């Protein structure tokens, strides 16, 4: 897949900052995006669930303000990593929050469920699936 133009035009290099469990949060994501790379965080890092919306609003607000103050800067989009496993009872509620705020990129881990892909695509969001092998990549593409 080629990098979509609206992303390519706003990144300094094709890099996604890893969504690190318990580490990645708004401060790191904002810094990454300001540096021109895609910042990301796991939705489950925002605890309790309502904090996810607060994080997304903060990230979007601070990046918009930075872009306004620095119109020539490449400010990359951000991503929310969704753990798509039966043990994640927040998945659909977290996706509702991501859809409400039109998170630019959703990163799925463990499996790419159709309902997550459809939800992200409903507003033009992109879905990247995190895989560890060629076999998993082929399975995700099915």
For each predicted feature, which ranges?
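Active-site entrance/lid segments in N-terminal catalytic domains of soluble metabolic enzymes
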Residues: 1-142
């Amino acid at each position: 897949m080629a990098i979509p133009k609206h992303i390519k035009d706003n990144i300094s290099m094709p890099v996604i900052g890893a969504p690190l469990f318990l580490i990645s949060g708004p401060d790191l994501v904002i810094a990454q995006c300001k540096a021109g790379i895609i910042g990301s965080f796991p939705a489950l890092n925002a605890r309790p669930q309502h904090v996810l919306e607060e994080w997304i609003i903060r990230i979007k607000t601070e990046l918009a303000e930075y872009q306004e103050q620095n119109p020539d800067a490449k400010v990359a989009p951000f991503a929310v990593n969704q753990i798509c496993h039966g043990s994640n009872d927040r998945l659909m509620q977290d996706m509702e929050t991501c859809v409400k705020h039109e998170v630019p990129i959703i990163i799925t881990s463990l499996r790419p469920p159709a309902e997550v892909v459809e939800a992200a695509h409903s507003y033009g969001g992109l879905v990247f699936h995190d895989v560890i092998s060629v076999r998993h990549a082929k399975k995700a593409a099915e």
